[in-house]
């Protein structure tokens, strides 16, 4: 695959330290617990502005990127026809291409606000998804997203969630 390029004229949401502090460790802890429950050994989850989590299972290496969707409460709202992942994450797909081998995988997890479910989106699905501008209450004008039809993603059940721990 050719490297994904920035979109001319597109904007990225400003970094919000308070949102990061509230969501990053919770999202990582939630998916680390899920991965460990499914036989993964966690190799790295330190903040390094790269993949959120690196794990190993059965000789395969998995890279995971995690994101909270606090607006998602209860069952998925089927009027939300797609899951949106910020296009700025294309940098991770490019980085993954540098380390990609037959036994490496990249998954994006979009986690429900109470941490009881998540959508798992494989890099191959993300790569073929439509990229376009989106509108919404928290979306900056000009910000682009991958638009993934939710029916094509994998809904995973997360034990009891971790929200009650915070």
Where are these regions (language model features)?
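Charged, low-complexity intrinsically disordered tails and linkers
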Residues: 1-8
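Catalytic cores of nucleic-acid endonucleases
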Residues: 10-18, 25, 29, 37-38, ...
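Conserved catalytic cores of phosphodiester-cleaving nucleases, focusing on short active-site segments
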Residues: 35, 53-74
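Non-catalytic C-terminal interaction segments of nucleic acid-processing enzymes
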Residues: 37, 102-105, 110-166
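Short secondary-structure boundary/capping segments within folded domains
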Residues: 43-46, 54-56
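Beta-rich catalytic cores
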Residues: 49
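N-terminal cationic leader/targeting segments used for protein routing and processing
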Residues: 58-61, 90, 165
């Amino acid at each position: 695959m050719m490297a994904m390029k920035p979109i001319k004229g597109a904007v990225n949401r400003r970094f919000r330290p308070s949102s990061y502090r509230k969501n990053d460790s919770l999202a990582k802890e939630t998916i680390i617990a899920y991965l460990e429950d499914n036989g993964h050994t966690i190799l790295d989850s330190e903040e390094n502005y790269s993949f959120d989590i690196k794990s190993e299972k059965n000789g395969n290496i998995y890279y995971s990127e995690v994101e909270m969707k606090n607006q998602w409460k209860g069952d998925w709202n089927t009027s939300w026809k797609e899951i949106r992942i910020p296009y700025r994450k294309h940098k991770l797909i490019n980085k993954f291409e540098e380390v990609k081998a037959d036994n490496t995988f990249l998954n994006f997890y979009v986690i429900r606000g109470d941490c009881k479910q998540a959508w798992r989106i494989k890099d191959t699905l993300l790569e073929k998804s439509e990229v376009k501008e989106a509108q919404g209450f928290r979306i900056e004008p000009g910000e682009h997203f991958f638009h993934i039809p939710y029916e094509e993603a994998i809904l995973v059940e997360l034990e009891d969630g971790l929200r009650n721990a915070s």
